[in-house]
Amino acid sequence: RDRIRINGDMISKDSVSEFMNDNLDFFKSNNLSFFEMTVGLAFDYFSNNKVDIAIIEVGMGGRLDSTNIITPVLSVITNISIDHTKFLGSNISDIAKEKAGIIKKNIPVVIGETQDEIKSIFIDASNAKSAEIVFADDFIYDNYDCDLKGNYQRKNMQTVLKALEILQQNDYKINDGHIINGLKKVSLNTGLKGRWEVIQNKPLIISDTAHNTAAVSYTHLRANETSS
């Protein structure tokens, strides 16, 4: 339930139960994965509640992910690192090609971090789809406060701010107050835990969900800065 929220509130147990009961035969006959069922649940819930805008996160990769059936108003690709190699490929270029699979015809795409070895993959994919492409780290933004304190969140914030700027250009009514308020309540609105989360100060205990080499390196760097 914590994966599906509207304005920070989790989907109700009744909504989950009703959806599962209505679609269980279909799930069984099509041998859907847990994630695929969850995606269907999210789409159904957002549609029934007539949300103004939905943020849909890819489960793994992009090209073949079950979320990729939608046509978004904006696509966002964060930094690329080695992960899920059994399914996405053993090198960063192969993984980037899978991620680039979410780029849609005439739909703008924000790339969160410029990585020289794969930059051309995203440019070629966007050109093939006539999609405007921007690299978020080419821009400088005001320093906003965020309740997620890991150093790596600076890059994430830069990506978010560029994405919001594009939405503003497409007539979405987002002002600076909305941005300030939203960034201060990321954990509350999303339920995210373990992002350089201070559990205790004396002694200092920190929880971080770093789960691949790149993420661990960021966490290790922040830990060294904290202890120095």
Task: Spell out what each predicted region is.
Residues 1-70, 88:
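ATP-dependent carboxylate-amine ligase catalytic core
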Residues 33, 109-112, 206-207:
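Short catalytic-loop micro-motif centered on adjacent basic/acidic residues
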Residues 42, 122, 219:
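Aromatic/hydrophobic pocket-lining residues that form π-stacking "cages" and hydrophobic walls in ligand
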Residues 48-49, 53-58, 66-76, 81-84, ...:
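Nucleotide phosphate-binding/pyrophosphate-handling subdomain across enzymes
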Residues 52, 108, 132:
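Residue-level detector of anion-binding/catalytic polar loops
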Residues 62-64, 71-129:
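Conserved catalytic-core segment of NTP-binding enzymes
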